[in-house]
Amino acid sequence: MITITDPGTALAVGNFGFSTSFTQTAQGTLALRVDNTGLHDSVWVGGTQVNLNGTLRAVVQAGLYGTTTTYKDVLATSASVNSRFASVTSSSAFFNATATYNANSVDLILTRQGFGAVAGETQNQRAIGNALEAGYSTALTGATATFYAQLLQAGSLRVLDQLSGEGTSGTQNTAFNSGVLFGQTMEGQMEAWRAGNRGGVASDAALGYAAEQPRGPAASAFAALKAPAMAQPRWNAWAAGFGAGQQLAGNASVGSASLSNRAAGGAMGVDYLVNPDLLLGMAAGGSSATFSVDDRATSGRLEGGHVGVYAMQRFGANYLSAQIAYSHFNNTTTRTITGVGTTEAAQGSFGSDQLGGRLEIGRSFDFGITAVTPFAAIQAARLWQGAYTEASTAGAAPGVLGLSYAAQSVTSLPTFLGAKFDGRVAFGNDMVWSPFVHAAWVHEFRPSRTITASLVTVPVSAFTIAGASAASDSARLDLGSRLALNRWWEVSARVTGEFSNLGQSYSGMGALKASW
């Protein structure tokens, strides 16, 4: 591409001059600087022929522009203008450029587009763009005027994504995932009990000493000598560790970017068998998680603490389980902002609280060493994020592009419909191996994740931005096994995967349990 421009000189009419004819081919670009006062570069052709083609490009200089600015005679000639540029463009995403062709000259017209009204904007770009437009005026002064003057030079609408803070919404999915992982440690203990790994009362047949029916009258004389029933363990203490990773795709029309997060942590708890059909327990744990939204140059960390209680009631082959958990997170975020003046780094720190619970019902069907259990569950969580303001820096100086975030409440409400397949193999000496496979369809009724923010140093109204959402529908698969070493010790492990059109997540968990 051949480009004709002269950025090293002051704006002035006629600063390009050709004494001969002027011809621009289809591959050529005539790039002329223009400013908000009407000054512009221009070309004077003294020859007898002007042949136009290619691109006429307006290179927008810093300043506050009105709706329309006309630049007269950006190309003038003593000859006639009988051809046209193939295209007329602007270096800024927020201007449309057109040309007017006269007998001996070409004029350039620059029309400013509202920050929230540019063709092709996403939902998020329109949201912050409309807020910025409401605060714009050619009469602005000081730092606000400088901000808008630099913004108007941006060559891509992506600058609005950089300003929006959209990537910080990644704290929400990350917090929900950490809470779910803690809940799965409690769920695992209830599942172990439901599947029958807790020991039981021994019968005569189990002892192998005599038939269940007496063989003669003398048998009654020895009835009192029957082996006593083995007491079922009533207490469990357990500890578990977990780790997980998730990838979620963004939404192009909304304007959200892809999110990835990682989490690891552990929990410990104790439960009590109130009666042969009722289990009650409590647990506490901690987690550490990170997230990254690469396309928004945003990352963060969440340090969480969790406490919860759980219960399961059996009604013959039916069961009902419930759990409730509270989590507190210390959140930190970091993002890099480019495209408006000097690159800035913005950091935020805030606390958040989460309350969640799960209710599940199911019925087991026994097929010898295998049981099949259809089940349905609902899992609700509410996350409250505190308000906070970023501290931004531009090199060693304070920044001007940081955001102030409003307090936010976000809900997750997935439901589960599926089946559990539990095996059971006894090896003797109270050692039992129990492999299992659980499969479910998961539907999330509240997948949206949003933030509401405003610029700290620029007086504009708040705007709401949507981040990467949770998947509305996904398939979940659990694979694992439990090994009861004897009546007092059990180890277990499982891996879980969720798969959807937006991405996938994987988690792993291991646990050790002592019973007495």
Residue ranges and their predicted role:
Residues L110-A119, K226, F445-V456:
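Primarily extracellular Gram-negative trimeric autotransporter adhesin
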Residues R382, A391, L401-W516:
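Outer membrane beta-barrel transmembrane domains
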Residues T29, R33-D35, G54-N173:
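Extracellular/surface-exposed low-complexity segments
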Residues M1-T70, R112:
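Extracellular beta-strand/loop-rich repeat segments of large surface/secreted proteins
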Residues A252-V254, D294-R296, V340-E344, A394-Y405, ...:
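Flexible, solvent-exposed loop segments that connect beta-strands
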Residues L30, Q49-V50, Y71-L75, L108, ...:
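Residue-level detector of buried hydrophobic side-chain packing
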Residues A143-A371, S469, D478-G480, S492-W516:
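Outer membrane beta-barrel translocator domains of Type V secretion systems
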